[in-house]
Amino acid sequence: MAATINGEGLTVVEYTAELARYKSAQKALNKDVSDTDAGKAVLEDLIAQILLAQGAKAAGHEISGSALQSRLDALTAQLGGADKLTQWESGHGYTDASFRMDLERSIDAAWMRDKIINAVPATADQVHVQQILLYNANEAQNVLQQLKGGADFNTLAAQYDPNARGDLGWFPKGYLLDPHVEQAAFSLQVGQISDVIQTNVGYDILKVLERDPGHPLSPDAYLAMQEQALRNWISQQRAQANIVLAP
């Protein structure tokens, strides 16, 4: 076994075949991935898939044999017949039995994934923020002093960003790439101005324009929240799971 996850085995044959498929896909994308990185990525993906499939079973999901066969029949027809399916399986490192098992697991995992992401609410606590982004620490401190002296934030924001006037729009927690900016934004009161925040991009000064505990998520933010929910679920399950890796 390459690993066991809560007593369910991940065979070396299955792992090796998936690794070969992964490397082939990366090569087709002209991506150079080391054997070590490829092995880690494949193992993590397989463990996540098994945990999701186990979660589906625990939640009461069960695909019937007839439904699974219908999926196989549809795929067989799509490929052009049973011989074509056998050729495809062979070319991708599958046997009939291993492909059937992998398909069932994939269906279970997809069901659980949909259950997790569909449970994410379409609204969230969000702030509407305006920023002044600068690339020099001294200039940032100078602008902050102007603001403290009564200068208009919107006027200064327009000076440094004539098009968008520094408007970041609405966003929830967990959406921004920089946690320092997000933490500062959610710690401010409406109308309050932050100190200078150093980021990987430069130096930010923020002003919270509005806050709404139930503001509708934008499509991008909703997708990000769904992805975060899925990552969190897998991380929690992984922490609680009994996972034994082969030496």
Predicted regions: what is each one?
Residues 1-24, 51, 56, 107-112, ...:
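FKBP-type peptidyl-prolyl cis-trans isomerase
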Residues 29-33, 142-181, 209-216:
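Peptidyl-prolyl cis-trans isomerase
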